[in-house]
Amino acid sequence: MLAADLQNRIMNYIRAHSGFETKRTYVGMSHLSECPADQFTTFRDGLPETDYNHRMAYLGYALETVEKAILVNAGVLRSVGREIVAEFDNRIRGHIDGETVDGDLVEIKTVSTVRFERILESGKALRDHFTQVQAYMHFGGYRHAEIIYVCRDDFRHHVVHVAYQPGLGEQIEAKARRVLAAIDEGRQPPCECRRSDASK
């Protein structure tokens, strides 16, 4: 078999089994840290179907599966996977990785060495991950979360504890409501990050 043919077969398989979704019928809680204008555009137009996105999705799901097996066999998790749906609108959804035996939310994040070192140095979760678990806790009724960071390059682990902040949870819900209102009106909401197309 020619090397080029072999490489094409591998990539074709990854594309077919990556689990990458170009478009969803809901707004993911994991993206509520993003600019409302970007969330609106993603909901309306979807995400580009690139080989990079397929590769990253496949790798992410593969590492997550391995990590969940470790956590279950280590006696850390009592359950794996759960869909959280906002009571006020089922278009706000999230999928958690699991719950500890104590009932805390668990979120697994695989990151590069650079980001892993940044987390170790600060002792804190990355901003978008922090907001993500705050959203899960707000809509899912959790009081505590454990973010398990896994370095993709050397498989180091680091756990960051995050406590629920009701005030922030309310802000996240208000933002989610604004995004849905914009979707219903078919009008892009104001940019809050100064990087999206809406700000130009």
Model-derived features: positions:
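Metal-dependent nuclease catalytic cores that hydrolyze phosphodiester bonds in DNA/RNA
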Residues: 1-105, 111-123, 127
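Beta-strand residues in well-ordered beta-sheet regions across diverse protein folds
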Residues: 108-109, 148
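Metal-dependent nuclease catalytic regions and adjoining charged, substrate-binding loops involved
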Residues: 2-4, 123-124, 135, 139-200
